[in-house]
Amino acid sequence: MSKPIQMEKGVKYRDADKMALIPVKNMPTEKKEVLRKPEWMKIKLPSSSKRIDEIKSAMRKNNLHSVCEEASCPNLAECFNHGTATFMILGAICTRRCPFCDVAHGRPVTPEAEEPKKLAKTIKDMKLKYVVITSVDRDDLRDGGAQHFADCNREIRELNPEIRIETLVPDFRGRMDRALDAMHSNPPDVFNHNLETAPRLYRKVRPGANYQWSLDLLKKFKEQHPTVPTKSGVMMGLGETKEEIVEVLKDLRAHGVTMLTLGQYLAPSRHHLPVERYVPPAEFDELKVIALELGFTHAACGPFVRSSYHADLQAKGEEVK
């Protein structure tokens, strides 16, 4: 019997090293042929990289992280070039090891106490009007990092009184009530938590997470803050059926969620879960119609849509594909 790997604190485990640490073996035993990307999945990069370099420089200066970089988002160039970014707080090492995600796994270090102030100043320097704050999972913290979210919201608003804040939170597994209490006095303008996939695929896609728990988190926040919109995102192309996605949409509506993102899953590397199917744009269009019929007030559905992709436009109800 092999000995468990002893992880060093602060060390990032990625790709094959990260996958080897997953207790539930989700990866196929036989090598599957990698699907070729269809034409609609090809990205046109911006001609100028000046704004991209400016944003990266501002983050490096204050030792901040963006999920855009840490998760290898395909929209990084477009979003950075438009002066938008999703900040990732509480470090860049996640205590979970989901096989779809490119964020590093490991034993994270203690959260930086000055991060909320640094984040607020960086946002002011960047002259942002809408900001998305997300984090890694921090199962090592008593409140899952919720107080840190609240501190960031407070500091950001003090320096940027006109700003709108969207938080994309983890599931706060085992500490939901404590987390919601911590965030109660400084809630965001939009509360986002992703279901990611259909419940049948949770063991494969989100080991350690629970579908109903995530739904309950969205519902409980909404009950405490009825005027704050709740939002969730789902990936497609992991082996789900269209019918399963429709059922997920119904579950979200039944738990008070009014904002939705649906996008195509892209494997960050050959070590991650493979893409089972590239969903055609027409199918995303069909699901958007269904979502609006179910009562979602905002539904961004398309191959390149991500939770925070043009989140400011999503919040305004503008078309995002």
UniProtKB/Swiss-Prot annotation:
Residues the record lists as binding [4Fe-4S] cluster 1: 68, 73, 79, 308
Catalytic activity: [[Fe-S] cluster scaffold protein carrying a second [4Fe-4S](2+) cluster] + N(6)-octanoyl-L-lysyl-[protein] + 2 oxidized [2Fe-2S]-[ferredoxin] + 2 S-adenosyl-L-methionine + 4 H(+) = [[Fe-S] cluster scaffold protein] + N(6)-[(R)-dihydrolipoyl]-L-lysyl-[protein] + 4 Fe(3+) + 2 hydrogen sulfide + 2 5'-deoxyadenosine + 2 L-methionine + 2 reduced [2Fe-2S]-[ferredoxin]
Pathway: Protein modification; protein lipoylation via endogenous pathway; protein N(6)-(lipoyl)lysine from octanoyl-[acyl-carrier-protein]: step 2/2
GO cellular component terms attached to this protein's record: cytoplasm
Record flagged with keyword Iron: yes
Recorded superkingdom: Bacteria
Major place of residence: cytoplasm
Binding site for [4Fe-4S] cluster 2: 94, 98, 101
Pfam families linked: LIAS_N, Radical_SAM
Comment on bound cofactor: Binds 2 [4Fe-4S] clusters per subunit. One cluster is coordinated with 3 cysteines and an exchangeable S-adenosyl-L-methionine.
Subcellular location(s) of the protein: Cytoplasm
Cofactor dependency: [4Fe-4S] cluster
CDD domains: Radical_SAM
GO terms of molecular function: 4 iron, 4 sulfur cluster binding; lipoate synthase activity; metal ion binding
The EC number(s) this enzyme carries: 2.8.1.8
Radical SAM core domain residues: 80-297
Keywords for this protein: 4Fe-4S, Cytoplasm, Iron, Iron-sulfur, Metal-binding, S-adenosyl-L-methionine, Transferase
Family that this chain belongs to: Belongs to the radical SAM superfamily. Lipoyl synthase family.
Name of the protein described by the UniProt record: Lipoyl synthase
